[in-house]
């Protein structure tokens, strides 16, 4: 999301609880998600001024962090071991990235889905889905347990209900899975591959669906979590080994952990950026959380307060993640 994609919203004042460099427990209450929570502070991992960092994905095979700058029109591959970041320009806004092989990844551009060579940046068309929808672009996307890419579209001017979520196979077969969405975001599956969670940001909700791994279809939609506007707007999402949900909070300076069974907020990671967009568990043991942020949609005061906005951050949340699914025809 960026300034072109938010509705005019009036946020109630929200006071972040300060904490030291080490994890520190605190009690924070909100209207909907009342709970005692552990608050942790994220630290700077890589300084960069991305306009709209998104698409967080940890490649466990290469131990690299894949991410995109949507408005900057770049795919990034960051290596924490060397603190280096490789960048590939894209011909239009790039909404998400998921690795396919050691040298290829699937990316979502404005006019369709492409395979990019992560050695030389060359791209090849896979699906022309929504090519005729020139007022739309693609946003967040992830792969299901069967290896299909699920990616959502949105209107460039955030007109409500103009987007859809599509399932795209490695051969390019495209199926519409969800329609009438506004700002398509966070997509994750539980480790037993029976539940799919999804975010349409302006709703302030995380929706749950039953997932059938035999047919790669969803059913039985219901609301798992309702997020108060006081803490921000739900953006990208990751899932941990306990099937708890980690959500980047746009306008919220944080990543929050939610229990989808109870709807409660369990913990929070404070991030020194106003707009937190996405996160992914990484590291050799999947015990670190890498976080993307945006440098757009801030007042002058907010820009001065968060000079590192747009950078990558990292935190140690105290729980481990799970390996994310690659784009592949193999389960």
Give the location of each predicted region.
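C-terminal motif of bacterial Sec signal peptides marking the signal peptidase cleavage site
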Residues: 15-18
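Conserved beta-strand positions in repeat-built beta-propeller and related beta-rich domains
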Residues: 59-60, 65-70, 106-111, 149-159, ...
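A short loop-to-beta-strand structural motif that recurs across blades of beta-propeller domains
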Residues: 74-76, 112-114, 163-166, 205-207, ...
């Amino acid at each position: 999301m960026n300034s072109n994609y938010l509705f005019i919203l009036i946020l109630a004042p929200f006071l972040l609880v300060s904490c030291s460099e080490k994890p520190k427990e605190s009690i924070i209450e909100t209207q909907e998600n009342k709970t005692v929570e552990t608050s942790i502070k994220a630290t700077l991992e890589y300084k960069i001024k991305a306009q709209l960092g998104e698409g967080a994905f940890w490649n466990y095979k290469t131990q690299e962090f894949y991410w995109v700058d949507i408005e900057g029109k770049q795919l990034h591959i960051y290596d924490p071991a060397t603190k280096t970041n490789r960048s590939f320009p894209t011909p239009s806004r790039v909404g998400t990235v998921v690795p396919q092989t050691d040298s290829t990844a699937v990316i979502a551009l404005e006019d369709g889905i492409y395979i990019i060579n992560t050695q030389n940046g060359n791209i090849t068309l896979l699906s022309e889905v929504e090519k005729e929808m020139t007022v739309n672009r693609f946003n967040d996307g992830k792969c299901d347990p069967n290896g299909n890419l699920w990616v959502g579209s949105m209107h460039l001017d955030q007109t409500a209900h103009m987007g859809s979520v599509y399932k795209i196979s490695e051969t390019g077969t495209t199926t519409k899975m969800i329609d009438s969405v506004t700002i398509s975001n966070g997509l994750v599956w539980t480790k037993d591959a029976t539940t799919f969670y999804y975010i349409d940001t302006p709703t302030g909700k995380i929706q749950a669906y039953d997932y059938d791994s035999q047919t790669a279809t969803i059913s039985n939609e219901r609301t798992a979590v309702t997020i108060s506007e006081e803490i921000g707007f739900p953006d990208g999402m990751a899932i941990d080994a306990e099937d708890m949900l980690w959500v980047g909070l746009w306008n919220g300076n944080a990543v929050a952990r939610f229990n989808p069974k109870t709807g409660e907020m369990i913990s929070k990671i404070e991030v020194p950026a106003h707009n937190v967009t996405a996160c992914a568990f990484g590291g050799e043991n999947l015990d670190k959380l890498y976080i993307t942020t945006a440098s757009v949609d801030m007042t002058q005061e907010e820009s001065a307060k968060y000079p590192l906005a747009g950078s990558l951050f990292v935190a140690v949340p105290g729980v481990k993640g799970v390996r994310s699914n690659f784009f592949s025809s193999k389960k």
